[in-house]
Amino acid sequence: MTATTESMTIANRFRNYLPVVVDVETAGFNPKTDALLEIACIPILMDDAGRFYPGEAVNAHIEPFEGANLEARALQFTGINPHSPMRKAIAEDEKTAIRRIFKYLKTVRQSTQCTKCILVGHNAHFDLSFLNALIERTNSKNQSQFHQFSVLDTVT
């Protein structure tokens, strides 16, 4: 172990951002009109040797918001049936789901001494656009742990 890795933390490795891998499943491409149906978040942590490892995953099955568009082709692609009784038994409303996820991420973020989370994903701005629309719909801006526009995108 070098002196560099001994003092390296996830906070100073990523400029005080905690990387969180995010994946969403949606009912279309428009974050303002189409439902966000599922979200999963996995914080990326770092051990004392400077190796990255996944933190505990947190996820939610989300009930479509009132008036949400459910594109048939998107549902066929994802295989999600938002009207399935089994899914309805575990699905949460948007506000409950996102605030539960943010509460967990806040705890992890604070334990790593990071100031914000940064969304990591494949085509990350797509996921972030749905997350930001959900934040706006649920008036959860003050609870959000994510940077509003910066991402780490695995496509690029």
Language-model features: locations:
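Conserved non-catalytic scaffold segment of RNase H-like nuclease domains
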Residues: 2-125
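Short alpha-helix plus adjacent loop in nuclease-associated cores
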Residues: 151-156
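Substrate-recognition/cap helix-loop segment adjacent to the acidic, metal-dependent catalytic center
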Residues: 109, 126-149
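Residue-level recognition of the N-termini of beta-strands and the immediately preceding loop/turn
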Residues: 115-118, 146-150
